[in-house]
């Protein structure tokens, strides 16, 4: 695919290489296997062989492995320079590095203002290590009592680890009775209308509304 797309460069400006999401609903579909640590690492190596060549030719890498590949391969995330101004960030390429860098920069320039707020933050399995790191830093700098939890995707299957495909059903079932504090913070991409920060009429992929989830969990989302 990379070789075919490379014929259209520089009209093709960037290529995101993302692992296919395999749900548990695959009866009768073409047999496909999820990536392992080994195969994810092999994919990264192939992509980087091409990207080094493109870097010399075009000045940018052009093709980039998504964050999921690095997580699956258990390799460290690249630095900001690797991503050439993040042309594929909306496809999960460099999102981890960008968020972490931005968070710790803001933390370094903000005044420390101790607070006694108590909140619970949830995310998907993939992003949990990063979100936990950021929440722990917020606690250390501001005294916020932050409980960080990961939601396992039982609705689509445990192979689906991104926060954007979590449902209200899994949120309610896994967090009922476990929430600490007066607020539950969720990734906005869990909602269908993720351009809106309002809970009015917004809902999850399984049609459970935010209002219904708030009522079931007895907490403000």
Each predicted region: which residue ranges?
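Active-site-proximal cofactor/substrate-binding loop regions of enzyme domains
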Residues: 1-3
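Auxiliary Fe-S-binding modules of radical SAM enzymes
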Residues: 6-221
């Amino acid at each position: 695919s990379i070789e075919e797309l490379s014929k259209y460069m520089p009209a093709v400006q960037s290529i995101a290489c993302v692992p296919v999401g395999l749900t548990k609903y695959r009866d009768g579909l073409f047999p496909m296997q999820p990536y392992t640590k080994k195969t994810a690492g092999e994919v990264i190596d192939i992509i980087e062989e091409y990207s080094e060549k493109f870097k010399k030719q075009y000045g940018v890498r052009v093709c980039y492995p998504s964050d999921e590949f690095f997580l699956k391969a258990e390799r460290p995330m690249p630095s900001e320079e690797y991503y050439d101004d993040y042309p594929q960030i909306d496809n999960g390429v460099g999102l981890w590095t960008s968020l972490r860098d931005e968070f710790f920069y803001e933390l370094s320039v903000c005044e420390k203002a101790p607070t006694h707020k108590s909140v619970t933050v949830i995310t998907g399995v993939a992003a949990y290590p990063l979100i936990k790191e950021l929440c722990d830093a917020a606690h250390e700098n501001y005294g916020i009592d932050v409980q960080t939890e990961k939601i396992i995707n039982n609705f689509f299957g445990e192979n689906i680890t991104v926060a954007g495909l979590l449902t209200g059903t899994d949120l309610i079932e896994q967090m009922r009775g476990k929430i600490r504090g007066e607020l539950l913070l969720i990734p906005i991409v869990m909602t269908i209308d993720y351009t809106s920060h309002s809970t009015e009429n917004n809902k999850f992929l399984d049609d459970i509304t935010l209002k219904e989830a708030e009522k079931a969990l007895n907490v403000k989302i």
